[in-house]
Every structure is written in structure tokens, then in C-alpha cells.
Amino acid sequence: MGRGLDYSILLEGSLKLKEISYIHSEAYASGELKHGTIALITEDTPVVAVVTQSKLQLKEFSNIKEVQSRGAGVILFMKETFELDKEAAWESVFQLPAMEDSFMVMPASAALQLLAYYVSLDKGLDVDKPRNLAKVVTVE
């Protein structure tokens, strides 16, 4: 879950998780949380949250508290300069190197790709040969 640029980052991260670990994953815009998405949250729901945009961090942390209150385990990727609620129950927290908001796409995207990579390795999958994927562009 994320807002603005973070949502775009999550779309890519979700795709990578599907492609190489074969786990169903959906990216959700945090602002849409109360329009149906919240109904899917249970104690067994892992939630990946990305918070890198300075102007949106307070709203995003508020949305994260909502999913935590429903028992979801949250894996948080956040800009290292943001203040973390240490009393909240986090599954994992990954602090990303701080830079201009518009450039946070780079470390956040790489972090989500690494998440997909290590989940795949943990499942014993060959990340270099994902099944049923074909190159879109071929060179003759």
C-alpha cells in the first residue's frame, strides 16, 4: 500500500513478486483503502507499505495503523529520515537512504525487487528462469 509515487513503486514490486515467486500480490492506493480493500485485511494478511513522500507520510502512517488495527502484519519500507512509531507492531522495517522525494523511486524499487528475489529463493525457486514468461521483444 502506498500513495502517489509510492503506489507506482508498489505496482512494479507486486508484479515482480508474482513473476518470480508465484505469489498473488496486489498493489493498492492507500487513499482507496476504505473503498473495499479494508474488507480483505485479516490477521493472516501480510501488507507491504512504502512511505517515501514527505508530504504524504502522515496520511500514509494513518492508513498503516488502520490495517495494523485489523491484525495485518506490516512490512514497511520508509525513508530513513521519517520518524517511526516504535510502539506499533511491525513485521519488518527497512529504512531507505534519504534523497529528494522524486528520486526515492530508485531505492524503493530496488528494495521491493530484492524482497521478491529473497522470497523466491526462500521458496527454492530459480529466479533466473521464471516459468511461463516470454520476452516481449525479440531480436532476429
Name every feature range the model reports, one short phrase each.
Residues 1-140:
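A SIS-like phosphosugar-recognition module
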